Swiss-Prot record:
Pfam families: HSP20. This is 17.8 kDa class I heat shock protein. Forms oligomeric structures. It comes from Daucus carota. PROSITE patterns: SHSP. It comes from the Eukaryota. Keywords: Cytoplasm, Stress response. The keyword Cytoplasm applies.
Amino acid sequence: MSIIPSFFGGRRSNVFDPFSLDVWDPFKDFPLVTSSASEFGKETAAFVNTHIDWKETPQAHVFKADLPGLKKEEVKVELEEGKVLQISGERNKEKEEKNDKWHRVERSSGKFLRRFRLPENAKVDEVKAAMANGVVTVTVPKVEIKKPEVKAIDISG
């Protein structure tokens, strides 16, 4: 059982991970000044703060993001300078018709952008992305580490 997740919002992450580009926001828990700004923050917070899991297997680095309601055309997966994986997207608000009467608006809208610095063992030319059931999965294969060849030397004498 780890203490770190309870201190940092229950997320499974390593605060000492040199590859993460997440930025700590010291003001994220402060209430916003105006109530209208507060409502805007509540409306977009769930989507804008998209959490992404990153696990490393013996063969690859695997990133997974839950993006319910988005189509694959609304999501971008890009590599910057062959070193930084960028996952972004946007969900627009539903258009309001003149005669519509809304009783509740709970689905979030807005943009999100997450960036991850890839480690040296990433095969950036073989990155694959797929989307199924609102989950984007990005697989970055790892370079196979070859074990050094060991040659036995006969001892004379």
